[in-house]
């Protein structure tokens, strides 16, 4: 099962935010953002922090590809 974060990157563009801004606002490590940039898996806790910071749902930032 693969994961796509294309929606997250588009949302960051729409909000005029950089990945570094996301790290600070969500309180997540740059390693987590790098992992997502490579299509890797991150913990649900990281995704929840991102959703809280961006005021969105997981469906707004992640696609699961079967």
Q: Where in this protein do the model-derived segments appear?
A:
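A short, Lys/Arg-rich alpha-helix, primarily the initiator
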Residues: 1-18
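The alpha-helix within a helix-turn-helix
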Residues: 12, 23, 51
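Residue-level detection of the helix-turn-helix DNA-binding "recognition helix"
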Residues: 13, 27, 38, 66
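Recognition helix of helix-turn-helix/homeodomain-like DNA-binding domains
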Residues: 28-42
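Residues in the helix-turn-helix
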Residues: 32, 46, 60
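Short, basic-rich loop-to-helix N-cap that marks the start of a DNA-contacting helix
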Residues: 39-52
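Short C-terminal boundary/hinge segments that cap the last helix of small helical domains
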Residues: 55-66
């Amino acid at each position: 099962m693969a994961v796509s974060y294309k929606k997250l990157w588009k949302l960051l563009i729409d909000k005029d935010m950089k990945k570094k801004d996301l790290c600070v606002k969500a309180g997540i490590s740059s390693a987590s953002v790098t992992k997502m940039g490579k299509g890797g898996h991150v913990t649900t806790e990281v995704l929840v922090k991102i959703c809280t910071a961006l005021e969105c749902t997981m469906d707004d930032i992640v696609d699961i590809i079967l």
